[in-house]
Each structure stands twice: as C-alpha cells, then as structure tokens.
Amino acid sequence: MDRWGRTHEALRHAGWTLFAERGYDATSTAEIAERAGVSEMTLFRHFPTKERVLLADQFDPSMAAAVRARPADEHAMRAVAEGIRQSWSQMSAEDVESTRDRLRIIAEARTLRGGIERNNEETVAALERALVARGAGHPQARVAATAVVAGLSTALLDWARSDETTLHAALQSALDTLGGV
C-alpha cells in the first residue's frame, strides 16, 4: 500500500475507533487527525467531511462489478440483488464485524440521517451505471437500484442494532425479498 493508502486507512481506523469509543457526535475531526498522527488539513484531503470518514463505502465498486457481470437478460431487480449477494458473500469475518460496528455507530447518530441518504445516492448511481452497462434503460435502472439500496439499508441497520442474526442471514432475507425470490 502506498503512502496515500496507508494514511487513508489510518484516518479511517482512527475515526471508527473514536466514534465507537465516544460516539459520532462527540468526536471532532481534530481528534481523528491527532489519533492518526496527521494534521486536520490532511484528514480533509482524504475525507471532505467527518461523515465521509464513517460513510465512505468501499463496497460500491465490487457491487457494481458484480451487477455488470450478471446475465444481460436478467431482470434489473434480480441483477442488483444477486450482484450484491455475490459481492457481499466474499466478505471476511473481520469485514463483517467491522461493518456491524460501523453500522451501529451510524444507527445511533441522529445527525447522520442526511449523510446516509447522500451516501446511498452514490451507491445507487454506481449500481444504476452497472445496470445501464448491462443494457437496462435509465428509468428502470434507477428505480431498481434505488429500491434495492433502500431495502438493503433498512435490513443492514436492523441487523446492526441486534445480535439475533448473522449478516449472511439478514442479507439473504432482504435480497430474496428484493430480488423476487
């Protein structure tokens, strides 16, 4: 990993750790930068806002690639659901635990509601582009991507708030419903 990547990961780790310890609202960008051993200006070169430290989604590219690889004749809703299922099934146990921790922080921080919506817009756009690349029309692609992301967001936040199920079970249930299984 190059210097930029190491700094980016150090900032993400520092932010997630502080958010878990103190809560999102009680953590400042200066504290994140200090914990990572960099200046606050460096933090803002990597993440334009504090919410991006928590909400920046590293899964969008792999989900979009999996959707693009789905059969061209597959319905858009099923293609998105199955592409996401395939992408997320490759998560390590460490990534699953980190995702649950991150989602718990998001679920508890009321000030992040608008940030979640903005972040979801980026995910919807990535999935919409993948569907269009497979041959779907723009309106169909937008509706399918938006529906799946909204449903998946609800399922993931519910999963994060409870200890009753595994990520795999929560995803399977949500994606089965969304994909029409």
Please tell me what each predicted stretch does.
Residues 1-22, 26-41, 55, 62:
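Basic, helix-initiating cap at the start of DNA-binding domains
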Residues 1-4, 103, 175-176:
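N-terminal intrinsically disordered/low-complexity leader segments
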Residues 129-132, 164-181:
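C-terminal peripheral helix-coil segments that are non-catalytic and often amphipathic
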Residues 145-164, 180-181:
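Amphipathic C-terminal alpha-helical segment
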